[in-house]
Regions:
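Glycine-rich N-terminal segment of FAD-binding domains in flavoprotein oxidoreductases
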Residues: 1-41, 55, 75-76, 365, ...
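C-terminal substrate-recognition/cap domain of FAD-linked oxidoreductases
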Residues: 178-186, 190-401, 407-409, 413-416, ...
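N-terminal glycine-rich flavin-associated loop
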Residues: 1-15, 37-79, 95-147, 212-225, ...
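Contiguous mid-protein beta-loop-alpha structural module that forms a pocket-lining wall or clamp
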Residues: 413-418, 424, 433-441
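A gly/ser-rich beta-alpha-beta helix-loop segment of oxidoreductase catalytic cores
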Residues: 24-25, 68-117, 161, 165-189, ...
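Activity-critical C-terminal alpha-helical subdomain
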Residues: 328, 332-335, 429-441
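Phosphate/pyrophosphate- and phosphate-bearing ligand-binding catalytic cores of soluble enzymes
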Residues: 129-186
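Amphipathic alpha-helical segments in well-structured domains
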Residues: 31-34, 293, 399-403, 439-440
């Protein structure tokens, strides 16, 4: 990699690092040299206290969890693509997922990082000698990081904006919260690299804190008459600490999922506007889990129909359907069309209005027959899928206008145009729309 970077500098050729390419936001497309890292950097090492794991950037996410399974541990980030996504992509996009939220993502669980910068400098933040050498060789960079931090600290409006923006999931632009959360320049740089999509350096290795994988789990499948009832219930779930995940699926998602034989009976009576929420709760003690289930039942009184299960085979099926919504939508699209998946985040109190705004855009721009909405509602994070024919000028223009209007709507709510999929080429033109000129510059 160091040689590739040296050659790229010599010949003034841009390079892009590609992990598994599961993000679909355009991070791994380029017109220069594409460096594919999935065949190398496979290091997995658990420390003796079993509270940290060192991972090479080429490790598949699920393999990290499989190596921790005998300890009943797991890594924090839990993207739906964890069976394919590589650690390099998970780290560089600050990918989160269904349970980790903002509390246990890559940024929050990072303990050390190993990186090569564009100038060839190498830094391993777990090695004091490497840190000292890096500081000595990169005084200008260290000073610039310090100056940016001082500039942010001196600007209350900007600092408050950064703090507010990162209370919810946000991968639009760089991790500016690093300048607020950390004082040491090396810590700032390490956390700036999270979510930087390879634009600041090549991250070859990370050390992450590991979490307990709680033994006892239960899930609930809750059906609501409309988005409002679902969103109001999710607001209540967000106030408690015993719900680890709440996945929302709109009517179009349920209609698509009804093609699965195993769910045909459960979904037989759904009507236009109905919404489903898949809940997960977990605990180290089964009796405590049972108590949590009863509390969930109390909170879920707005649901017109509900299913509860501690049977792994049963709730795994529910999760399988949730995770399969993207391939289901892909299989139902018309010939020649493209699967587009977007990823936004609203503050939890704006969730219902935000979802309705997206649905209105579907119909305004001609995607009402193929647009579906689902996502990690406990974090206010929703995904939507549309399938435009980008070779059709009208559909291309409609898609372009939808994305532009969506970006302005999400920004008007104080939300994130990209919550966990990374900025990529898709959202790069809209970073300033969300952040404003002051933060963007």
């Amino acid at each position: 990699i160091k040689q590739i970077i040296q050659l790229a500098n010599t010949y003034k050729t841009p390079i892009t690092f590609r992990a598994a390419g599961t993000s679909l936001s355009g991070q791994s497309s380029c017109d220069g040299v594409l460096v594919v890292i999935k065949f190398a950097f496979k290091k997995i090492k658990i420390n003796k206290d079993a509270n940290e794991i060192t991972l090479g950037c080429g490790v598949v996410g699920i393999h990290a969890n499989e190596s921790l399974a005998f300890l009943k541990k797991k890594i924090g980030p839990d993207p739906a693509t964890i069976n394919s996504a590589l650690i390099g992509g998970i780290i560089n996009n600050n990918s989160s997922g269904m349970c980790c939220g903002t509390k246990d993502n890559s940024y929050k669980t990072l303990r050390s990082i190993r990186v090569i910068l564009a100038n060839g400098s190498m830094l391993d933040t777990s090695d004091a000698l490497s840190v000292a050498r890096f500081k000595d060789e990169n005084k200008k960079l260290i000073n610039e990081l310090r100056e940016i931090k001082e500039e942010i600290n001196a600007n209350k409006e900007l600092k408050d904006l950064i703090i507010k923006k990162f209370k919810i999931k946000n991968t639009t632009g760089y991790s500016l919260n690093a300048f607020v959360d950390y004082d040491d320049e090396i810590d700032i740089l390490a956390h700036l690299l999270i979510g930087s999509e390879g634009t600041l350096g090549f991250v070859s290795e990370v050390k992450l804190a590991v979490l307990d994988d709680l033994e006892f789990k239960a899930c609930a499948l809750l059906f609501f008459d409309n988005i409002n009832n679902a969103a109001n219930t999710i607001k209540e779930f967000a106030k408690v600490d015993f719900v680890s995940s709440a996945e929302i699926m709109d009517y179009a998602s349920l209609k698509a999922a009804s093609t699965y034989d195993e769910l045909r009976d459960i979904l037989a009576d759904i009507k236009e506007g109905n919404t489903c929420v898949l809940i997960q709760s977990e605990h180290s003690n089964e009796l405590k889990l049972d108590e949590n289930i009863n509390k969930i039942k109390e909170i879920s009184k707005l649901a017109y129909k509900s299913y509860f299960s501690k049977n792994k085979a049963e709730y795994d099926l529910w999760w399988k359907i949730r995770k399969a919504l993207l391939p289901i939508a892909a299989s139902l699209r018309k010939a020649g069309s493209t699967v587009i998946t977007e990823d936004v985040c609203f503050n939890i109190e704006d969730l219902a209005d935000g979802i309705k705004s997206i649905q209105e855009l579907f119909y305004k721009y001609g995607f009402g027959d193929n647009g579906i909405i689902f996502g990690h509602a406990l974090a206010g994070n929703i995904h939507f899928i549309i399938t435009p024919d980008l070779n059709n000028k009208l559909e291309f223009d409609n898609f372009s206008n939808l994305v532009k209007e969506m970006s302005n709507i999400v920004a008007s709510y104080g939300g994130s145009i990209k919550a966990e999929h990374g900025t990529g080429r898709m959202v790069a033109p809209f970073v300033e729309v969300e952040w404003g000129k002051q933060a963007y510059l």
